[in-house]
């Protein structure tokens, strides 16, 4: 009888458990960025969907990677450009990096290849021009916004709908991360983005670091002028970059202190470096055949990322010449024109399973542009690197890995075939590179929580608590002179000067009185003698 009673109640218990699970589920708005930025953000979104959250992704109808195979609601809006326009402008930008590097805010502002940024920055105007979509978002009652800050549209959306936001990024160009999080960044040992400096800067480098910081404050507002105009138009009030970035609840930063130099951080800055790493799978048979044919020498993996498909012919031939002089088999991800001097040991492929190949025991080195995804896959799998940075954070990533003895950096504009050959032979034959990258790999993997789980936790945290105001520093409420304690310094200086002035006056008065009295005594004594 009792057993029958329990059996009868079983469906009720199941329903209660399911109800509890759904009660904890929230509603999340996702505003992503196209290209490689989406690769790891997608993994967080997919896990949130698996955990029962209702996810809505808002994206432009023109994109390279966005929204593919997502089991959630995807809302698109029309854009003022076509996919051909986007491809063309990106090719202009990428091709220009083979002739003119971006090493400062001024060079970025004055570059003639910035059309791709104008396209991306226009997305938010297109989104808010879709009144039907805006109305849908307004009525959806989201718990939070999960966003990539590259084009600032997610930040504008969060501010427009008054929603707490979780930013997902490697870093923020200009000074907007430090300003938005109110995080100190001493210029004496925290290098600015794009410079490719280490934390142990020479006097000259510290001078350049200060100049770069000044450049950012002078020129970044002009670079983001279109974004700020669009934001002001949408929010119907003058908007600064600080207004957009300073309301972020949590910063999910795709780095950690295995890659980064030690520096001050704030409590709402969460480090999830290596979130793109995963357990390597067996490589496809085609690639396994290449590996087996390489013999004892093994293979070298060569990829400049998903966004760089072609290399200038002269440079491609110099690279091909260097690759032909090493005994390893080289798997080169390349879709450009086949170099005429390509050696037999070099195999061109349009796609390769990068992480799986790096995890193969026969992989000896990785030639990379030093994007954060590739660098972390190299760290996770313990493969030394030859780095050829092109733009963005790549110069900084390369410098960090070179400083830690995990690879060699080459200037892609100036390097010769011999430079690449020597760099490859160094990282393959010098055991210190392998030992250093394995040490970094061990440090990176020694953590209490996996980066993906940590990212999911903090997104859910913001959804549950409608933000994280307890992590917001009071520095946001101070004026610039209060933040730097200039009013306190001024007051204390005034007190010291006042006390010094009064003391001086008292001493002067006492001295005059004393001197006057002594003078009168002398005068009286002199008159008596006469």
Swiss-Prot record:
Keywords: Endoplasmic reticulum, Glycoprotein, Glycosyltransferase, Lipid metabolism, Membrane, Signal, Transferase, Transmembrane, Transmembrane helix. Residues 1-25 form the signal peptide. It is a single-pass membrane protein. SUPFAM superfamilies: UDP-Glycosyltransferase/glycogen phosphorylase. GO terms for cellular component: endoplasmic reticulum; endoplasmic reticulum membrane. GO terms for biological process: coumarin metabolic process; estrogen metabolic process; fatty acid metabolic process; flavone metabolic process; flavonoid metabolic process; liver development; negative regulation of fatty acid metabolic process; retinoic acid metabolic process. It holds the Pfam family UDPGT. It is found in: Endoplasmic reticulum membrane. PROSITE patterns: UDPGT. It catalyses: glucuronate acceptor + UDP-alpha-D-glucuronate = acceptor beta-D-glucuronoside + UDP + H(+); 17alpha-estradiol + UDP-alpha-D-glucuronate = 17alpha-estradiol 3-O-(beta-D-glucuronate) + UDP + H(+); prunetin + UDP-alpha-D-glucuronate = prunetin-5-O-beta-D-glucuronide + UDP; 5-epi-5-F2t-IsoP + UDP-alpha-D-glucuronate = 5-epi-5-F2t-IsoP-glucuronide + UDP + H(+). Glycans are attached at residues 71, 292, 344. InterPro entries: UDP-glycosyltransferase (IPR050271), UDP_glucos_trans (IPR002213), UDP_glycos_trans_CS (IPR035595). One of its GO terms (molecular function) is protein heterodimerization activity. The chain crosses the membrane at residues 488-504. This is UDP-glucuronosyltransferase 1A7. It comes from Homo sapiens (Human).
